[in-house]
Amino acid sequence: MVKSLAVERAGSSAIRDLLEITEQPEIVSLAGGLPNPATLPTDAIARAAAAALEDDPLGALQYGPTEGYRPLRRWVAGRHGLAADPHGEEHVLVTSGSQQALELLTRALVDPGGLVALADPAYVGALQALRAAGVDLAAIPADGDGLCVDALADRLATGERPALVYVVANFDNPSGSTLSAERRVALAALADRYGFWIVDDDPYGDLRWHGEAPVPLRELTDRTITLGSASKVLAPGLRVGWAVAPVEVRRAMTTLKQSADLHTSALTQQIVHRTLAEPGFLEGHLVTLRTTYQAQAEHLVGALRTKLGDRMTVPEPDGGMFVWAELLDTTADSAQLLDPAVAAGVAFVPGAAFGVERLHPTRMRLSYATADAASLDLAVDRLAGVIPAP
């Protein structure tokens, strides 16, 4: 049996394991944060692929620079407020999905045994990457306004010194919360005072349909590193993500990426750039995504409140892809409900999958992004047959 220390530390992702189960056609999955298939812009991607192979076949099919395709890096820099900087792309590293960006960043800035602070509950992929790197985790409470920055401040005051503070500031995964404007200012001030890096993982920021987005953390302190991805706004199968960071951090990550995979696929980078940079495409596509996900979110929340309102509380999302539902029975354990739910033909992610120190037994993450209205209704009917009535 082959099992290194890194494998043991990382563990298996509950969500990735569930995806294999939910590929079965009889199961309605509320588990993975997969884009709705109807929203995937296949025609635009096909045009971009054909253009890349016709206009620049060598650039699309040959080895490329580790930093990434320069036109894509310039586009990302512009989206992150660096359009006026003639060397803005020097802050951008293109990665094989934002998951690789987090893994490289952790290796670049935190030695094994170093400390990383993050909300509890936390994104499963982040937990895997951080644990595989052998860092220690400081679990910080979170609520409807995101990471409790005052609790972090208390930990800092006692002498704890995280190298990184990881947040999903816009529509946190799994909780769906957005870090409030006041807490962003406070977190930025703490970073400047204590010298840690803020890692703002932002795959969902463009998927907002209610309210105004708070000021990005990167505009509040230069100790912010922003991670982004084409997965949620274009297509996850292209596996293109990025990090926007101070140049010295980007260079350190580039060195590590050279030893990992040399560079992200040149062809998919060109496809992503040509698609996203096509005049008028992104604005129209984001309208489609927001309209679709808002309708699906409202449909799922309405169905859950109608059929399971006596058994769970369900918040109303303002964006993103998830509902962080809570069972009203304080003795319940959502992990114990998963096998019966799958047997009944519906899947979700138990709260325990997101736990840093706590298990969140009464919580479950439900994604409304993938399924259509009829499938969401069916999923709720099946859940109603599994979750005990009061």
Regions found by a protein language model. Give the residues of each.
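Conserved glycine-rich beta-strand-loop-beta hairpin in the small C-terminal domain of fold type I
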Residues: 291-301, 313-326
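Conserved PLP cofactor-binding pocket of PLP-dependent enzymes
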Residues: 27, 203, 342-365
